[in-house]
C-alpha cells in the first residue's frame, strides 16, 4: 500500500492495529500521527474537526473507563493506492465505569456496546471518519 508503513500487511491490518495501539496500548497521542490535522469526525453527537478533539475525547473516555477496550471484530473495505482506502469496521467496546464524566459518578458497572466506524484513509492516515455507537446498551 503506497504511503503506508510497511509493518501493515494490508488495509484491514492498518485499521485494526491503529485501533489497538490507541486504545489497548493507551497510545492516545498517536492519534496525531494517524488522524489528519483537519479530519472531520461525524457522529450522532455532531461534527468535530481536527485530531485534537479526537485526542481530548479519547482521554476523557479513558478517564471514565480506564480499562476500555475496542476489540475489532471485522473490517470490510475497498480502495487502491490511487484513490485511497475506505473501511467500515465493527468493534466491540467494553470497559468498567470507574471515573466521573459523561455518565456521572463512577458506578463500577461493566459496559459492552457495538461501534461501527467508517474511515477514509491515505498515506498512513485517516482523513475522514463517520462513527456510530449503540449507546442504548449502556445502563449505568
Describe every region a protein language model picked out.
Residues 1-138:
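C-terminal and inter-domain tail/linker signature
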Amino acid at each position: 500500500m503506497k504511503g503506508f508503513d510497511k509493518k501493515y500487511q494490508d488495509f484491514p491490518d492498518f485499521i485494526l492495529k491503529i485501533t489497538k495501539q490507541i486504545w489497548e496500548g493507551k497510545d492516545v497521542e498517536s492519534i496525531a500521527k494517524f488522524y489528519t490535522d483537519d479530519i472531520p469526525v461525524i457522529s450522532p453527537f455532531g461534527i468535530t474537526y481536527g485530531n485534537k478533539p479526537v485526542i481530548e475525547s479519547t482521554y476523557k473516555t479513558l478517564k471514565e473507563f480506564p480499562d476500555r477496550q475496542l476489540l475489532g471484530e471485522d473490517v470490510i473495505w475497498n480502495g487502491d493506492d490511487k484513490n485511497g482506502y475506505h473501511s467500515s469496521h465493527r468493534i466491540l467496546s467494553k470497559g468498567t465505569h470507574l471515573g466521573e464524566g459523561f455518565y456521572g459518578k463512577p458506578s463500577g458497572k461493566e459496559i459492552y456496546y457495538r461501534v461501527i466506524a467508517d474511515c477514509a484513509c491515505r498515506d498512513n492516515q485517516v482523513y475522514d471518519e463517520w462513527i456510530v455507537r449503540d449507546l442504548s446498551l449502556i445502563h449505568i
